[in-house]
Amino acid sequence: MREVISVHVGQAGVQIGNACWELYCLEHGIGPDGFPTENSEVHKNNSYLNDGFGTFFSETGQGKFVPRSIYVDLEPNVIDQVRTGPYKDLFHPEQMVTGKEDASNNYARGHYTVGKEMIDSVLERIRRMADNCSGLQGFLVFHSFGGGTGSGLGALLLERLNMEYGKKSNLQFSVYPAPQVSTSVVEPYNSVLTTHATLDNSDCTFMVDNEACYDICRRNLDIERPTYENLNRLIAQVVSSITASLRFAGSLNVDLNEFQTNLVPYPRIHFPLVTYSPIVSAAKAFHESNSVQEITNQCFEPYNQMVKCDPRTGRYMATCLLYRGDVIPRDVQAAVTSIKSRRTIQFVDWCPTGFKIGICYEPPQHVPGSGIAKVNRAVCMLSNTTSIAEAWSRLDHKFDLMYSKRAFVHWYVGEGMEEGEFSEAREDLAALERDYEEVGQDSMDNEMYEADEEY
């Protein structure tokens, strides 16, 4: 069995976790109490081991299924909602780790003071869970860049996981600060510091920003004032599509290592852009054909992206198309050929093929009350493109505005952090921007050279 352990850190991580496990349970026919429902695959197969979902659930002697996940937060409020909510019986009490005081939106508190006191007990729970795995494949870490716990404790956890489980895959799902919408003033500080700290400890980071998700909910789902629950259920559909090939059988399955192999050309350039299609409300669903060609085309439209940036200005290095539901390889081939023939979608010249395809035959599951209509096929596109550097430069600019006046820095230094870490982190992000520039530049230079030769 190739097990995967999910770790949900801080408020964003925990709330996305709730939406993900709610969806996984629906997909696999597991009730909120952890026991299989009547139409569950367990009854069809007589054994969960025949099926891929043992990668995400472990089975107890009583026939109950327990998620392979850990919830971590420095304050108890958000996790208490899970402890008393509809899925309270799904999780083992030991899977919930809470502290007594929060990180106050301060990376240094999450990383150096409050978080440091808690990290060993978190790792002990992870160790116990890893011991129950026969062939641990890796970790999925869910957190936000902007909060204190998500950024500080998230970075510390990834550091320690890398030390103790260096050979295992480490994938992050991170809520990135939105361009206009902000949840705290010091978001740029926390984000730059956590990116610097995790750059060498994460194999692949899938980013989503709240503003892009708000826009998708408003435009595609006709939800006038989207709540975090709407956003999280949308993100859960994306996470489910990425992990579907680990949990279900399919003709072209993709495992954790394959994501890195196909999407990350250089170790530091590991931030794929995520796009999902179709996202339609129930009212619109009957009027759209959602053919393979159509949903593939929608993935290349900026308005379906989970991070605000313009892919038409950059170049694609690698693209992973993960289809699920009623999809046949021939249709996918036709869709990809038509995409390649477009002049607007440009690939770097050192990666001419550029497409990795995954097909999982399990259709997307509809969550009641999510606003997303039930569809018979969907696609999630993960693309490593140079245009995501736009997001980094936006973040760096906000950081510079505050740091030039040393605003709020004393709160971080007061928690035992060196002021030099700010400039070190900022330099690292400047280097990251340059890395993206160079990768795109190589192609530009070659093109100019070829044009000169033709002339």
From Swiss-Prot:
Keyword Magnesium set for record:
yes
Site feature Involved in polymerization: at which residues?
455
The biological processes this protein is annotated with in GO are: microtubule cytoskeleton organization; mitotic cell cycle; nuclear division; nuclear migration by microtubule mediated pushing forces
Under the heading SMART domains, the entry gives: Tubulin (SM00864), Tubulin_C (SM00865)
Where this protein primarily resides, as one coarse class? cytoplasm
An annotated Gene Ontology molecular function: hydrolase activity
**Binding positions (Mg(2+)):** 75
- Family listed: Belongs to the tubulin family.
Complex and partners: Dimer of alpha and beta chains. A typical microtubule is a hollow water-filled tube with an outer diameter of 25 nm and an inner diameter of 15 nM. Alpha-beta heterodimers associate head-to-tail to form protofilaments running lengthwise along the microtubule wall with the beta-tubulin subunit facing the microtubule plus end conferring a structural polarity. Microtubules usually have 13 protofilaments but different protofilament numbers can be found in some organisms and specialized cells.
What is the annotated role of this protein in its UniProt record?
A: Tubulin is the major constituent of microtubules, a cylinder consisting of laterally associated linear protofilaments composed of alpha- and beta-tubulin heterodimers. Microtubules grow by the addition of GTP-tubulin dimers to the microtubule end, where a stabilizing cap forms. Below the cap, tubulin dimers are in GDP-bound state, owing to GTPase activity of alpha-tubulin.
Q: Please state what the protein is called.
A: Tubulin alpha-1 chain
